């Protein structure tokens, strides 16, 4: 009698998860529409095809909106993967220094290249920096140190990278590098269709990662249980770290360092009952894109004469969550 009962519970959970994904999809569509409407001038959807509004909507706002959505999805999914791979509920690209590693590589490349290098070289340097920090963290994680120490190591690496970026900007006379430092606070100003190749590179990685829920379910059980299930743990960790590093590097190349999205989104969804990684990954992509679209809209319209760095908005949103998670996990 227990098997039918278990089967019914599993079916009910699947239906709840699908309903949650449907609600998250509706939330993403709503925030996408608001993002396209909002700006110095509010443009209703009925006016999007007007000749006078096409430049604002299709050439300026649409590429930015797509970039925000993809970066939000990338950071939220990367946070979910990091929490599973490192077995640390507080792991996320910004907090563990991965995004800062991408940023310092980008700044040093601009400094050494004197602002003359093409965008694809800067993107590759950001990816390399993110991968370097991620593999360092993976090395420490394999030494079975505590979650607290791994968290502190990640924070220390992030502080070191931030210090290097600050020194580079302080001693630089290049206006490009000073503007880049402002951009490293997080922002999507200047995004247009010329950055479309970065978005197209990010999209297949997101789609592939969203299909790896079964593997992540095994990894969350622990290394021994995962091996008993036939999962090649070392190989999957390496592959997931590579994909995650590339995603974070591309995200930093597009928008700079944006913290806390990878931390708060997975925990919010888990608190809402979305615990199966097969649904959680997709949910993180939808929720991450929607939340970052909201933050970007706030950053654009909060001030009349300027634009807030989106990293400031997400840090304001995420800092209370981080404190709460620290207290909840008694670290």
Swiss-Prot record:
Signal peptide: none
GO cellular component: plasma membrane
Membrane-traversing stretches: 21-43, 63-85, 90-112, 116-138, 151-173, 193-210, 239-261
Membrane topology: Multi-pass membrane protein
An annotated GO BP: cobalamin transport
Cellular compartment(s): Cell inner membrane
Coiled-coil region list: none
An MF annotation (GO) of this entry: vitamin transmembrane transporter activity
Function (record text): Part of the ABC transporter complex BtuCDF involved in vitamin B12 import. Involved in the translocation of the substrate across the membrane.
The protein, known as: Vitamin B12 import system permease protein BtuC
Name of the gene encoding the protein in the UniProt record: btuC
